[in-house]
Structure formats: C-alpha cells, structure tokens
C-alpha cells in the first residue's frame, strides 16, 4: 500500500466488506446516510462506529471504535496502542515535539525510552512527517503505532494543555507566585480577569478534578516534595501516581482548591477541613471533602470524592446476596434499637447506611442524621453536621435530635462514651439508631462498646445486630483466567469451616480495560450478626471476645473470610485479594 494516503470512509468500507466484516447492506447504509457539519469532521472509523453494526466475523460483538481500531491495526500491520493516562509521563511525552507539529500532523508521542520513541497516529499511511521528526530526534529511533481516533483526539490537546499550564506557572517570578497570583485567584468570583499564569492554574485544577472523576478515583492526593510534587489518585483502593509537577506549581494548585473550599489560604501551619461542590463530566453534581496537613515540604491536600451514585445504588450492587438482604431488611424494620455497621475507614460503611436510610425514609417517618461531615446531601433526610468550633459533637447532636420527634436517627460514628450513651438512650426511648464503629469484625463491636464504657446490660438490651464489611477489588471480566488453586492459602483462609476446595479459581491477568491491574471496580463482603437471646446473655455476663466468637459460630454466623471465599468461588474476586483485605484471626 502507498504511503502519504489518508484513509477515508469509502476506503474503510471497501476493506471491511472485502474482509467479510460488514455486509453490502451495511456499506450502502453508511454511504447513503447524510452527515451533518460536525460529523463531517469525524474520523472514518468514528463515523462507521456511529452505526453500531455487528461484526460479521463475530456476530455477538458490536463494531465499536475499539474493535474497528483493532481491525485497522491488523490491516495495516501496526500494533494498536491503548493509552493509559495513569501511566503517561506528560512532561516527557510533550517534550518530544512541539504542540504545533503534533496538531498539524495529528500525531502524539505515547512512550519514550532511551532507544526509541513510540509515535501514535490514526492515519497510518500519512508519513510525510517522519523524516523531519527522525532528524530532530536522532539517534533515537521512531516506531509507529496506531491509536484509536477517540484517544488521539482527546489526549493530543489535553497533554499539551496540562504541560503548558505547569510550565507557565513554573516560569512565574517568586513575587507573582506568592502574592499577585493568590490575589488574582481571590478575585475569580468577581468580574475581573486573572492574568495568564493564574488562568493556567485554574485549568490545571479543573483537569485534575475531571480526570479523577473519569478514572473513578475515590481520593485525590496532592503531595509536596523538595523539588517536585506528586498528584496521586486512589482507584479501587490502590494509589496511582498521576503526575509530577514543580513544587511551586503544586502550591498554587493547592491554594486554588483551598479558595474553592473556602479555607484560609494564608494559614499553612495547622490542618484545615473544607468542602467544595463541582460537576462530573456526566453533569452530576458532586462534593469533595478537603483536608490539609502541614508537612516538611509544604502543605499537603487530600480530597475525598463523594460518589453521586451512592444514593441510587441497590443492595445487590453493593454485594448483598439474597439471604443477607432479607436479614438486613428484617433488622432495619425494627421500630427501636441500635444497628451497627463496622469496618475500617474506606470500607463502604457510609454507603451501606445511606442505602438503608434511603429505603426507610418514607413520608410516614422522620429520618435525622448527625454526621462529620455530611457526606451526601439527600432531600428525604434531615441532616446535621458536627461542628467542633462551637462545641457541637455527636453526643450533643443526638441530644438535640431527640427533641425533634425523630423515628430514625443515624449517628455518623460512635467514637466516645458520651455518644455511645446517647445512642443507647435514644434506642431505649423508642428510636431506631443506625451508626458505625471501627472494629475488625462483628463480634469485636460488642467488646468495643464495653471498652467505651457502655454497661453490658444496656448493650444487650438495645443492640439489634452488627454488619461488618470490607471492599474487595473485582476481577476484570475481560482478562480473568482460571488457574490452579494454592491449596495452602485456601486452607488458611477457610480453616475451621467446611468449604469444598475447587481445583481451579479465577485470578488476575491485566489488560487495557483494567490498566494492566487485573481488577476493575470493587464490591462488598459482609459478616452479619443478629443478637439472639444466647448472645445477649453472654454480653450481659461480660463474656470475652473468644466466647462471643464461639457462640456466633454456633449460630452459623460466618466471618468475613468465609464471605470472601464465596466470592472467590463465584469468580468475582481472587484469593490473593481476599487474603489482602480480610482479618484471618
């Protein structure tokens, strides 16, 4: 095939028909469909993908843009490169060529190492730029790869925009950075236009937030270092380094976010907390909780992203099976008593509570919450926030809510004796109380209440049940494979319980869909313990933790590790992941 030839829709359709991937009818449909002004700018593969055709060689699979890109890569004999933005070194990639050269030729550097540079394009036969680039990059070799048109059109302008924003901020003078820039940022709410450097910071902050939403991050970490700061995202419970930027640029980014969160920009010596509202790329309103911390190299900022889909997520999506769902719903239908959800920070406790309250919050009941902070605004709850500045704690909040004629009270966390006692008083006076504790498993919550100073007979009289939970990463459905089981690890996980050992289980591999991690998304595993008469008697008699666990086992209550083992058998997660997350004692 001849170089310097730009593929068009006609060429693609003829080749697809020749290869038996589309029918004559499909070709005619695409050729005779009118394109509007915007669609005329599309790449041929994007226009063909628009019709959602079936791949005639694999009738069960649609001809989406990725599949069409794979076909074109095979056709022209080039590898298809899928950009993983989490692993891209934007500074290095954009230094390969100027933005003008990249935009003019519709190419992008996607990987750089000492011997060669990978250059991505969506027009594999247009190569009149190669000789010029080889000359400027010698002695490094150039290797051509094919990019999906969607990826090229997104990351080509985005990479250069981010790089330009960082460099513009880096080149500002010390006076501009420390004074003029911050003053201009403070005026962003007015009608005045900030200078160029500050506008770059605004764009950089927007890119960080939108990128975090797209990647499904739960937390954003902005971490200062001596020379270069780091931007990290927590995705599926694991931190990924996204970007390195000069320390002064990161400082300006943090200042911008502090202003948006209404924090004191000048105060960098003590921790601060705040919130900001923004919108996701899908247009959903979401909130971020901000927390700053003074460190040796400057102020560190962590943003916790509250998932706007939390309140519309079903229990099945959270990981509840049919039996657990019935038990949990029966427990939450009680008119009074205490229900606890336990687990470490980030284990999904708040999501479970919100989902439960959403079902309970009908027009016939008054649902009140006291939280620190309010994690998700919901119109069917009456939500109240703890405020240490005015001495409004959880215990004070519960005391105030008791005078508001509540039916159901949600206490964000029982962390001291006063809060525990107020929750018990609320339960004794005819209210249903839902709250959280930080314990490793369900039986431990009983001894934890005792440690907080709650009288055992009061715990026995008011506690209805406990749900302990963890979040495990789900295996990527696109690449998981069966492999032989590690018998020793399986026996370690299921000790003292009779669960048949399978010969093979699914494990992680890694592909473009899961960023080579082998996992995509997370799901809950649960240990549910309802307090029957025997357990209540043990609690009243101040039984130790081993006695409580023994009685729970007699009742058929299965620990978290067994719930994890069942998820392994279902092919949902891996043995290594469950062993990483659950307590084995």
Curated annotation (Swiss-Prot):
InterPro entries: P-loop_NTPase, T2SS/T4SS_dom, T2SS_E_N_sf, T2SS_GspE_N. It holds the Pfam family T2SSE. Gene3D superfamilies: 3.30.450.90, P-loop containing nucleotide triphosphate hydrolases (3.40.50.300). Disruption phenotype: Disruption of the gene reduces transformation rates by two orders of magnitude. Natural transformation is undetectable in the pilB-tfpB double mutant. The tfpB-pilT mutant makes very few T4P. The pilB-tfpB-pilT triple mutant produces no detectable T4P fibers. GO terms for cellular component: cytoplasm; plasma membrane. ATP binds at residues 346-351. GO terms for molecular function: ATP binding; ATP hydrolysis activity; metal ion binding. The keyword Protease does not apply. The keyword tRNA-binding does not apply. It is found in: Cytoplasm. Keywords: ATP-binding, Cytoplasm, Metal-binding, Nucleotide-binding, Zinc. Zn(2+) binds at residues 476, 479, 511, 514. Belongs to the GSP E family. ATPase component of the type IV pilus (T4P). Acts as a molecular motor to provide the energy that is required for biogenesis of the pilus and the extrusion of substrates generated in the cytoplasm. TfpB is required for optimal T4P extension and, consequently, efficient natural transformation. May play a role in initiating T4P extension. Both PilB and TfpB are essential for optimal T4P production, with each motor playing a distinct role in T4P extension. Overexpression of tfpB does not restore the transformation defect of a pilB mutant. This is Type IV pilus assembly ATPase TfpB. It comes from Acinetobacter baylyi (strain ATCC 33305 / BD413 / ADP1).
């Amino acid at each position: 095939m001849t170089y310097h030839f730009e593929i068009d829709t006609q060429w693609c359709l003829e080749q697809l028909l020749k290869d038996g991937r589309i029918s004559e009818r499909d070709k005619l449909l695409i050729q005779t469909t009118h394109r509007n002004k915007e669609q005329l700018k599309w790449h041929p593969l994007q226009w063909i993908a628009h019709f959602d055709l079936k791949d005639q060689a694999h009738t069960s699979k649609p001809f989406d843009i990725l599949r069409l890109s794979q076909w074109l890569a095979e056709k022209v004999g080039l590898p298809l490169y899928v950009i993983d933005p989490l692993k891209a070194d934007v500074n290095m990639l954009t230094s390969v060529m100027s933005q003008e050269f990249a935009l003019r030729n519709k190419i992008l550097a996607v990987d750089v190492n000492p011997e060669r540079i990978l250059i991505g394009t969506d027009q594999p036969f247009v190569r009149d730029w190669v000789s010029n680039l080889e000359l400027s990059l010698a002695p490094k070799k150039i290797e051509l790869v094919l990019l999906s048109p969607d990826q090229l059109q997104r990351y080509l302008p985005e990479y250069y925009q981010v790089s330009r924003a960082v460099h513009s901020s880096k080149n500002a003078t010390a006076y501009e950075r420390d004074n003029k820039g911050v003053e201009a940022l403070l005026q962003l709410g007015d009608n005045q236009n900030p200078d160029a450097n500050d506008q770059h910071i605004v764009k950089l902050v927007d890119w960080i937030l939108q990128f975090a939403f797209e990647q499904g991050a739960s937390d954003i970490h902005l971490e200062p270092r001596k020379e270069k700061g780091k931007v990290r995202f927590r995705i599926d419970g694991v931190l990924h380094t996204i970007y390195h930027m000069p320390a002064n640029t990161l400082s300006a980014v943090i200042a911008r976010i502090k202003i948006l969160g209404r924090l004191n920009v000048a105060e960098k010596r003590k921790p601060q907390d705040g919130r900001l509202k923004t919108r996701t790329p899908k247009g959903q309103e979401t909130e971020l909780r901000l927390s700053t911390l003074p460190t040796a190299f400057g102020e560190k900022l962590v943003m916790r992203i509250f998932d706007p889909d939390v309140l519309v997520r079903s229990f099945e999506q959270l990981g509840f099976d049919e039996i657990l769902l019935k038990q949990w719903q029966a427990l939450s239908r009680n008119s009074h008593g205490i229900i606890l959800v336990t687990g470490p920070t980030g284990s999904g406790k708040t999501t479970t509570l919100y989902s439960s309250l959403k079902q309970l919050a009908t027009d016939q009941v008054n649902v009140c919450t006291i939280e620190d902070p309010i994690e998700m605004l919901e119109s069917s709850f009456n939500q109240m926030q703890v405020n240490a500045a005015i001495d409004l704690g959880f215990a004070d909040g519960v005391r105030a809510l008791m005078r508001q004629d509540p039916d159901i009270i949600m206490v964000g966390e029982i962390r001291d004796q006063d809060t525990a006692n107020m929750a018990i008083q609320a339960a004794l006076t005819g209210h249903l109380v839902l709250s959280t504790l930080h314990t490793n498993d369900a039986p431990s919550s009983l001894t934890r209440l005792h440690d907080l100073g709650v009288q055992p007979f009061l715990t026995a009289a008011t506690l209805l049940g406990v749900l302990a939970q963890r979040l495990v990463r789900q295996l990527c459905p696109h690449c998981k494979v069966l492999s032989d089981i590690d018998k020793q690890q399986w026996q370690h996980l299921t000790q003292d319980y009779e669960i048949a050992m399978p010969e093979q289980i699914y494990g992680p591999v890694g592909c473009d869909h899961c960023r080579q991690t082998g996992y995509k998304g997370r799901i809950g595993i649960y240990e549910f313990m309802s307090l029957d008469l025997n357990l209540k008697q043990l609690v009243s008699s101040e039984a130790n933790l081993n006695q409580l666990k023994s009685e729970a086992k007699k009742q058929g209550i299965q620990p978290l590790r067994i719930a994890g083992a069942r998820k392994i058998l279902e092919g949902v997660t891996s043995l290594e992941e469950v062993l990483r997350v659950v307590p084995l004692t």
